[in-house]
Amino acid sequence: MHPYTGYAGFICGNQVQFDVSRKSFLRVINAFNKNEAAKAFLFANSPFDHMDDMALTRDYFWEYSMHGLLKNNVGIYSEEFQTEAEYCQYQEESAMFYVIRDNCYYYFKPITVKSFFEQEKFAAYSETGEICHFVPKADDFKNHRSYHYQELTKRGTIEFRSTCTQPFETTFAPIAFHLGLLANLVKLEEILESTEFFKEFGRNYSKLRRQFSRKKLSDLEQRMVKDFSKTLLDCAHEALLLRGYSEEKYLTPLYNSLIDDFGVL
C-alpha cells in the first residue's frame, strides 16, 4: 500500500520509446503487436490476490479502467495496418477525454475522436467540478492520448508500454529486448511469419496475451511459449551484439528465466 490515502492508486510500468521513421512505423507496430504473448510470459510481474491465476493483472486494470470504455483505446490492436490511412481510421475510434483551455484542464466522459470533432459544442468539467461548454478545436487533437501497447507519439517515437515494472536488477532487460528486436526488424518479421507458436495457438493476439499471462500453463503451452521466447531473445541478442555496446548482457536474466529446475530450456 502507498501512503497517499487520498489518491486512488498508482500504476507502474517499464516503458521505453525509440525513434522510428515514417516509412517503418507501421511495420514496427504490426510486428510488436504480435509478440505480446511472449512479453507477457517473460515480463509478467503484477499478481493480484483477487485474481489467483494471473501473473499479469496490469492489463486488466488498464482495460477495465476509464481508458478501456472504448475498446479501440487500449491494449493490442485488433488489426494489422497496411497504410497510414488505415492506422488513422483506427485511431479515430480511440478516445478523447479532456481538453486544455487557458492552461486549465477540462474533463468529460470518453468519446471517440471522430465523434468529438463532429460535435458543435460539448460539456466538460473543470478541476473543481464546474460544468463548462466549449467548441472543439483542431488543436485539441494535440492532447489526444490513447493507451495501446505500441503507441506512436507526437515526438515521432514508438512507445512500448505493455511491460510490468521489473525487479531493480533486471530493469534494463525489457529495454534491451525491445531495442534488439527493433534493430533486427526484418528477421523479427520473418520469425513472426513462420513460427510454430502461431500455428499451434492461432493469431488472436489479445487472446494469446491473456492466455500466457496466467501463472499455470499446460506442458504444451509452457514448451511452446519458451521456444517462441527463446527465438525472439536470440533475434534481439544477435542485433545487440552487432551494435557493439555490450547491451546483450541485459538479456542474460531472460535467458536464465527460461531454464527450469533441471537446467533445461
Regions found by a protein language model. Name each.
Residues G9-I11, Q17, H50:
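FAD-binding core of FAD-dependent oxidoreductases
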Residues N14-D19, I158-F160:
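Short cationic amphipathic helices and targeting signals
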Residues M1-I11:
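Well-ordered mid-protein domain cores that form the structural environment of catalytic cofactors
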Residues Y7, K23-N30, K34, A38-A44, ...:
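C-terminal accessory/tail domains of diverse enzymes
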